[in-house]
Curated annotation (Swiss-Prot):
Name this protein carries in UniProt: Short cationic peptide-4e
GO molecular function, one term: toxin activity
Tissue: Expressed by the venom gland.
Organism placement in taxonomy: Eukaryota, Metazoa, Ecdysozoa, Arthropoda, Chelicerata
Family note: Belongs to the cationic peptide 04 (cupiennin) family. 08 subfamily.
Superkingdom of the source species: Eukaryota
Main location: secreted
Amino acid sequence: GFGMLFKFL
């Protein structure tokens, strides 16, 4: 989910 994207940020 978007959780992974937020981790990269």
